[in-house]
Amino acid sequence: MGENKGYITHVEELGSIHISEDVLASVAGTAAYEIEGISGLMHVTSKKGHARGVRVSVESDRAVLDLFVIVRYGFAIPEIAEKVQNAVISAVESMTGFSVKAVNIHVGGVSFNEKF
């Protein structure tokens, strides 16, 4: 597995698979948003200038995902964060075949609405 201009590459016997970092971010963000207690993702600017609540990097041929979330008031942040981490790892690994090294959760806000 390697990195090439915004894509994560996995070399297989039959050829290479290139998946955009934006795809990994989208999968991770969707998995996080499905967790009860998550109101939404914060808008952060990535190095490429795209606003999204997920940053993707590669360390030791494994994906590292940073998610910037807004938690609904009344939910235990540590429990929600762990649920998000597990959901993101499961979704990214099953949909892309790439290993996830870490999912770092950054809670940047609390919402009183169900979804932000």
Identify what each model region corresponds to.
Residues 1-34, 38-47:
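Terminal low-complexity, intrinsically disordered regions
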Residues 2, 24, 58, 112-116:
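A domain-level signal for the structural core that forms small-molecule/cofactor-binding pockets
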Residues 30, 78, 115-116:
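Short, well-ordered secondary-structure micro-motifs
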Residues 36-39, 52, 101, 108:
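A short, local hydrophobic-aromatic micro-motif
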Residues 39-70:
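Short edge beta-strands and adjacent turn/loop segments
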Residues 65-82:
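A short interface-forming secondary-structure element
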Residues 77-96, 100:
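Short, non-transmembrane amphipathic alpha-helical segments
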Residues 102-116:
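Short, highly charged C-terminal tails/helix-capping segments
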